[in-house]
Amino acid sequence: MTGKGSVNHNSRKFHAKNSDPERSCLNVEYCNENIKDVYHELFDEALARYNDKQTRNDRKIDDYYEKICSGKQEKPFHEIILQIGNKDDMGAKTADGQLAAKILDEYMQDFQRRNPTLRVFSAHLHMDEATPHLHIDFIPYTTASKRGLDTRVSLKRHWRDLDLRAAQGAKRNVTSG
């Protein structure tokens, strides 16, 4: 999902029909931060630098989060949902379901390190539905923008930077191997 994930569903502020409230205690909350607070953390300094350079008041940005929400180029956040198998082969109440939960937990524990430009603000492992699955909500950003804010929301730049890191790693392996 892009910008339409349900953080309230993920954090179980309400229960969907397909969840079992008696098993919600088995869910894991890795983080659950307010998205606006995370936007301030990521972008306030860049926003101040950008606004200081502007000579026209109509070019200044008052609230970067609201600008992204009302714009059409970027989404305020993205959500990925990861699941291994299905309810028939990895049901949450089975040993295989517990294995799936362990794998998803390990994946999440290292997600931020592997993806430094995807700022995770909400992440939950659900064990109260038919199959264990992981919700990760994140804000993609770049710190190397030459136009506009130098630090800004950009999923495209994240993928480009990831490709560059992979290519550099492959080059190191070829030259050292």
Question: Model segments located where?
Answer:
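N-terminal nicking endonuclease/strand-transfer module with a His-rich metal-binding environment
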Residues: 1-177
